[in-house]
Amino acid sequence: MDISVVIPLLNEKDSLKELSDSISDVMKSYNFSYEIIFIDDGSSDQSWNTIEELSSKSNLVKGIKFQRNYGKSQALHAGFLKSQGKVVFTMDADLQDDPKEIPAMYDMIMNDNFDLVSGWKKKRLDSIIFKNIPSKIFNFAARITSGIRLNDFNCGLKAFKKDVVKSINVYGEMHRYIPVLAKNEGYKKIGEKIVNHRARKYGNTKFGPSRFLYGFLDLLTIWFISSFGKRPMHLFGSLGLILISTGFLFAAYLGYDKI
């Protein structure tokens, strides 16, 4: 299979059929073999019913249903486990990501031998206060802390070699910095492509003021995993050595003081 498209979602029933149809149109135009994997992250609307209906009409559309909201990272991880394509795409379900970008990004993976290609929403059609400004700050700091020269870490539209998504463990809020996880697993050829970003057509954004807090916590996590990767004990071991040494010196001082 050429391509798997992994799409996490929460309460996006109105956009799913249109998204599925537009992806299928692109795939058929380029004769790609493909699958579309929707992961319903505990939606309270009719999203799952729509996924079941789409799946009943085409065995190329598959669905995973969470009984409650676990978060985007867990949804992506479940989709990665199920994916079979040589190239795995991630895409948001709100129709802001354009499926027409898929062929060029696929070519970058297969012919230019990138491990990962991240979309760059250079011209964003989002709230300036709640998305644009926080994203610019976050991306600047993420470049500094991770050493990865991306302009848009958090773009939902990404393409991966299959081996990459099978090697990383995405949990918590780590969906925001999958490129850092990939780099720490040895996948260092990371590319970027300017992509078309469209205005949200249905519903409202799921982001709010808490994005600022999450962004700050994300930066701490990026610094940690970029600095220590799979070797967190290097940090804790160093701290432990400092504490033990301090305790030893203090005990020696007390012992000397009693002599």
Feature annotation, model-predicted:
Residues 40-49, 95-96:
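A conserved acidic beta->alpha catalytic loop
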Residues 53, 62-68, 72-82, 87, ...:
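Acceptor/aglycone-binding surface of glycosyltransferases and processive sugar-polymer synthases
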Residues 32-43, 64-65:
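Short beta-strand/loop segment that forms part of the nucleotide-sugar
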Residues 12-27:
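Short, well-formed alpha-helical segments that are part of the catalytic scaffolds
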Residues 2-4, 35:
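Cell-envelope/extracellular polymer assembly enzymes that use nucleotide-activated donors
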Residues 14-18, 45-54:
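Acidic helix N-cap motif at the loop->helix transition within catalytic regions
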Residues 177-259:
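Hydrophobic helical membrane-anchoring modules
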